[in-house]
């Protein structure tokens, strides 16, 4: 089973992906994690990624699709796409890739959380990390969140209509206890 978790920054996508990995043995494909791992891998793709990043350039969709292809071909018991796709062009590229490797996209789960709650979550996440002596993400502040939300609404939210038209979109309330959100996602996956 392959799924995409969609939602604005701070919606809890990473938290819920972690639960799915633990409970269902799925593989989380986080583009950020894949790029960092590729950079240090010493592979041909890794050297390409390192060169692009070292020059301060944006990693192209083609490179990201190549990394995802490697993961899909390595196999697994279902994939969670986290941080990809972010645009309609990327959604089309992912659909083409899945078709090429003989896989399907089973569900796109959109996590609903209002902006006010997102601000509270992000501020709280930063406070909890600082209190625990852990590093605070540089973008875990209200000003950065506003910029990230603008980007999300501009570029990523059109994916909601795209996947709705394909009858793959499922809404799950993202507010509430982590376990309640996880149950909502499980209900979608088990339906």
From Swiss-Prot:
InterPro entries: Adenyl_kin_sub, Adenylat/UMP-CMP_kin, Adenylat_kinase_CS, P-loop_NTPase. PROSITE patterns: ADENYLATE_KINASE (PS00113). The keyword Ligase does not apply. Pathway: Purine metabolism; AMP biosynthesis via salvage pathway; AMP from ADP: step 1/1. AMP binds at residues 31, 36, 57-59, 83-86, 90, 137, 148. Consists of three domains, a large central CORE domain and two small peripheral domains, NMPbind and LID, which undergo movements during catalysis. The LID domain closes over the site of phosphoryl transfer upon ATP binding. Assembling and dissambling the active center during each catalytic cycle provides an effective means to prevent ATP hydrolysis. Belongs to the adenylate kinase family. This is Adenylate kinase.
């Amino acid at each position: 089973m392959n799924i995409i978790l969609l939602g604005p920054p701070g919606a809890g996508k990473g938290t819920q992906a972690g639960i799915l990995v633990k409970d269902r043995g799925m593989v989380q494909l986080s583009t950020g994690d894949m790029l960092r791992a590729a950079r240090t891998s010493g592979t041909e793709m890794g050297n390409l990624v390192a060169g692009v990043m070292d020059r301060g350039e944006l990693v192209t969709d083609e490179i990201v699709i190549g990394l995802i292809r490697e993961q899909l071909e390595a196999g697994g018991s279902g994939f969670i796409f986290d941080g990809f796709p972010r645009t309609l062009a990327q959604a089309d590229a992912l659909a083409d890739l899945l078709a090429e490797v003989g896989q399907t996209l089973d569900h796109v789960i959109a996590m609903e959380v209002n902006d006010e709650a997102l601000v509270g979550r992000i501020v709280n996440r930063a406070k909890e990390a600082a209190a625990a002596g852990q590093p605070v993400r540089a973008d875990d502040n209200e000003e950065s969140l506003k910029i990230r939300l603008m980007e999300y609404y501009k570029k990523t939210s059109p994916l909601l209509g795209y996947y709705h038209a394909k009858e793959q979109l499922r809404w799950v309330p993202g507010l509430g206890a982590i376990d309640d959100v996880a149950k909502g996602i499980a209900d979608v996956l088990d339906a």
